């Protein structure tokens, strides 16, 4: 399966690594460059974008994935 995980903090990063280790294609998204850098060699693709900005989200292949997981925990409003 193909996943997009938005938010690569504690939960999102572990989930991304585990899904990738199971053979799934994982696209990771976060605003924090350091978080993206840590995972860039462990997952298929990564983006440094603000997922709360609709225009930024347009670069993601949303129509080509099976599941999108929003793992933003710091700001409840951003996860909606």
Roles of regions detected by a PLM:
Residues 1-80:
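Cytosolic regulatory regions of ion transport systems
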């Amino acid at each position: 399966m193909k996943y997009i995980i938005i938010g690569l903090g504690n939960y999102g990063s572990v989930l991304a690594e585990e899904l990738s280790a199971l053979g799934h294609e994982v696209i990771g998204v976060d605003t924090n460059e350091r978080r993206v850098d840590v995972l860039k060699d462990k997952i298929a693709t990564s983006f440094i974008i603000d997922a709360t900005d609709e225009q930024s989200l347009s670069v993601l292949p949303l129509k080509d994935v099976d599941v999108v997981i929003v793992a933003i925990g710091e700001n409840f409003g951003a996860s909606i």
